[in-house]
Amino acid sequence: MALLKISVVVPEGEVYTGEVKSVVLPGVEGEFGVLYGHSNMITLLQAGVVEIETENQKEHIAINWGYAEVTKERVDILADGAVFIKKESDDRDDAISRAKKLLEDASSDRLAVSSVLAKIESL
């Protein structure tokens, strides 16, 4: 299976870069998945969790909003704010707290924020 290149960038710099099997993005019309060979598109992203599947594990990045450019071979995410939540990390609890704060500040839609926060807490 061909791998997809992905980068997640915020104004302060790069949050994540790598080669992945798939990525699920929080689009404004709902979540959608991207695999290698996807049609080209540019889309607006809402507050949510970017789910990244690598060869060995799943990784998660909380974003407050942004844009994604998808091509056949890569996904470039430009976000206003992002927190990488590493599964095997000493600062995991701190990352989850920062992700919750980022998402709570991103939207006044309490129902949508609650749904995303529940997803983060289950990681």
UniProtKB/Swiss-Prot annotation:
CDD domains: F1-ATPase_delta. GO terms for cellular component: plasma membrane; proton-transporting ATP synthase complex. It is found in: Cell inner membrane. Produces ATP from ADP in the presence of a proton gradient across the membrane. Keywords: ATP synthesis, Cell inner membrane, Cell membrane, CF(1), Hydrogen ion transport, Ion transport, Membrane, Transport. GO terms for molecular function: ATP binding; proton-transporting ATP synthase activity, rotational mechanism. This is ATP synthase epsilon chain. InterPro entries: ATP_synth_F1_dsu/esu (IPR001469), ATP_synth_F1_dsu/esu_N (IPR020546), ATPsynth_dsu/esu_N (IPR036771). Its main location: membrane. Gene3D superfamilies: F0F1 ATP synthase delta/epsilon subunit, N-terminal (2.60.15.10). It holds the Pfam family ATP-synt_DE_N. It comes from Helicobacter pylori (strain HPAG1).
